[in-house]
Swiss-Prot record:
Source organism of the structure: Pectobacterium atrosepticum (strain SCRI 1043 / ATCC BAA-672) (Erwinia carotovora subsp. atroseptica)
Primary residence: membrane
Protein name per Swiss-Prot or TrEMBL: Protein AaeX
Annotated family: Belongs to the AaeX family.
Encoding gene, per UniProt annotation: aaeX
An example Gene Ontology CC term for this record: plasma membrane
Length: 67
């Protein structure tokens, strides 16, 4: 038996990790919008790889310590 219950919204069941993914995606877009004007992407070798790593780090932090 899982310690995290399945959440049901409008008759659709979602695993708890789905909501953590949605929150981390929202937080990623906010952080990405804050980083773009700073010019940090000029120093990044591969922006898509940087964005993927940033999302993975945010997801890990939220899943491990947050939600």
């Amino acid at each position: 038996m899982s310690s995290l219950p399945v959440m049901v919204l409008f008759g659709l069941s979602f695993p708890p990790v789905f909501f953590v993914l949605m929150v981390s995606l929202t937080l990623f877009f906010v952080v990405n919008r804050l980083l773009q004007p700073t010019g940090i992407y000029d120093f990044v070798w591969h922006p898509a790889l940087f964005n993927s790593a940033l999302f993975c780090c945010l997801f890990y932090l939220l899943f491990r310590y947050g939600l």
